[in-house]
Amino acid sequence: MPIVLLGFMGVGKTTTAHLLNLPVYDMDHIIEERIGMPIADYFSLEGEASFRQLETEVLKGLLDLPSNCIVSTGGGVIKSEVNRELLLANREDNVLLTASFEVSYQRIRKDRQSQRPLFLQCSKEEFEALYRERMALYQGLADTVIDTDKLIPEQVARKILCK
């Protein structure tokens, strides 16, 4: 099974994945290719439930990949109970990247390339509630947990390669 990077928005999953010198399968990019539009647009047109169903289909396919690759998940992949069950079965190969709420919030705010629909729709307080809800769902899904608050992406990548 592949190494699967989990974590809330802004913890560095995509950035770190590309530093590991292995083939990278970014779930958000795969989904955008499949739907032919940015996720934010799909969210607006089809709603979150439709997006999560598509996300589950993509996750199932990616978990069947060989062990010499990286899967970078979307920040909300754990919202689906089906996805959490799939990830739990893969927990020894999962790496949970964490960051404090404030660090995640500032990283997302500064990221001009990614328009994250849930971030754009929420006040800071609502976004913090979302962060806390999702962090609780991540618990137990990965044997390896790395706090990225004070690490640069290269340090995070080294920790993953040494696991």
UniProtKB/Swiss-Prot annotation:
- Location of the protein in the cell: Cytoplasm
* Pathway given in the UniProt record: Metabolic intermediate biosynthesis; chorismate biosynthesis; chorismate from D-erythrose 4-phosphate and phosphoenolpyruvate: step 5/7
Q: Which GO terms describe its molecular function?
A: ATP binding; magnesium ion binding; shikimate kinase activity
**Reactions mediated catalytically:** shikimate + ATP = 3-phosphoshikimate + ADP + H(+)
Bound cofactor: record note: Binds 1 Mg(2+) ion per subunit.
Hey, which family's this protein in?
Belongs to the shikimate kinase family.
Name listed for the protein in its UniProt record: Shikimate kinase
Q: Which gene encodes it?
A: aroK
